[in-house]
Design a protein with these regions (language model features):
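Active-site-proximal, glycine-rich beta->alpha crossover segments in alpha/beta enzymes
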Residues: 78-179
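N-terminal basic, low-complexity leaders that serve as flexible interaction/assembly modules and, when applicable
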Residues: 1-91, 170
Length: 179
């Protein structure tokens, strides 16, 4: 604990922080919950399943050095953009993606964070479920929000945003101020 606290202060106690984990031998592993979901979206959005999956995955790892078991709710890298209206699509395993919604810079004022979004509610439910099953077993972190430039790229489309960096610099700077 002292070493990690020193790390965040850019200090060194006795050695650098070393974090890595290994899979436990198969005979020491617990079964990973089997998904009975009918769609990838249903599986991604199931808070209890995601919490049980996190517990099994972390139980099946050995945390070495200064590593700590950490799980976080996850709906993919563009969930923040979905809170601003981008349709969110879920892949079978590993990632999700959105469709851009900002076709014209004049429409940026119509984008607002949806505090009642089902995705935000799902992240809250996952956080609560992970806190319940992880109590005394692992740390629960926050989702990776991908705000700022990542969110703007999803809202506008990455290739379009790249071209916008030539013709719409002021709009980009303004948008980054509130994303």
């Amino acid at each position: 604990q002292q070493r990690i606290a020193a790390f965040w202060e850019r200090e060194l106690v006795d050695r650098p922080v070393v974090q890595f984990h290994l899979s436990r031998p198969p005979e020491q592993c617990v079964p990973v919950p089997v998904s009975e979901h009918t769609s990838p979206e249903e599986r991604w959005m199931d808070a209890d399943y995601q919490a049980r999956l996190a517990l099994a995955n972390l139980t099946n790892r050995e945390f070495l050095g200064d590593s700590l078991p950490v799980a976080y709710p996850n709906l993919g890298p563009e969930v923040f953009s979905a809170l601003y209206g981008c349709p969110l699509h879920f892949g079978d395993y590993g990632t999700s993606w959105t469709d851009p919604v900002l076709q014209d810079w004049r429409d940026i004022g119509s984008l607002h964070l949806d505090w009642s979004s089902r995705y935000l509610r799902a992240l809250h439910a996952m956080t609560d479920a992970m806190l319940d099953v992880g109590r005394g077993k692992f740390i629960v972190g926050m989702t990776d929000w991908h705000s700022g430039g990542d969110a703007l790229a999803a809202l506008r489309d990455p290739q379009t945003l790249a071209l916008d960096m030539i013709d719409h610099v002021a709009e980009i700077k303004q948008a980054l101020g509130w994303l």
